Amino acid sequence: ICHHCGERYIEFFPNAKQENLFIGMIHAFQYMGIPRYVLTDNMKSVVLHRDLDGRPVWQKDYEAFMRTVGFDTKLCKPRHPFTKGAVERLIRFVKENFLSDRVFCDVTDLNWQALEWCNAQNGIYHRAVDGVPQQIHDAACSSHLRRLPDSDEVRGYLCPNRRISFDGFVNYEGRRFGVPYSYAGSTARVMRSGDTLYIYSTDMNSLLATHAVTWSHRDSFCEGQYEVQPEEFPTAPVKTQLRQ
């Protein structure tokens, strides 16, 4: 949520892994832009502890993420209801105004409805900011925000690395997705976008397979998963024969 105009973006994940924190933050930056500061709770995926002078000791992967994307983080002060409330008020607002009395088919449907709800909320008048959040954001906030850089480092956060099992599957969000047997690498990168899951080579130069995200716990096989590579035949006539 933008502290100045109240524009909001929410996204749900099936677990609270740090890689999903990074994916959700990148999607929020794509939606609203990158601010100078991000206010966050004192989560272990963000900060380990504070030193003797009270300065935060960042979790190393989060610190690298900050440097890559280009923003600084401010932490909620312990036992300080004003800053703590700034983070938790949105959670309460979402629970009471979005999640209440709704039925969702799966996480994909949940996020589609969440995005529609955010667009609707950002486009109506809110008394707290005395205006329409989207209009205030475009007029006053956008000039202070940066666009998300289109770099291999950022794409790497959107496509986490996964090890390929001996039977040709990668595990992502509690389910297994097939990788073509012809791929020689031991790892692959995985990205879920909407209702489709994409599997790329480790260098992200090749798309290996796509899967429909059904949220079923059954293994998802890709087309021709166990087919061997096609045999190459000579183009010129064969003149030499071997007799056994």
Name these PLM-found stretches:
Residues 8-15, 48-53:
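The substrate-binding groove and active-site-proximal loops of carbohydrate-active enzymes
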Residues 1-6, 13-14, 39, 65, ...:
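Short conserved beta-strand segments at catalytic cores or DNA/RNA-binding microdomains
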Residues 91-191:
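Active-site-proximal acidic segments at structured loop/helix or strand boundaries
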Residues 10-37, 214-221:
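Active-site beta-loop-alpha junctions of metal-dependent nucleic acid enzymes
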Residues 55-73:
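Two-metal-ion acidic nuclease core segments, chiefly of the RNase H-like superfamily
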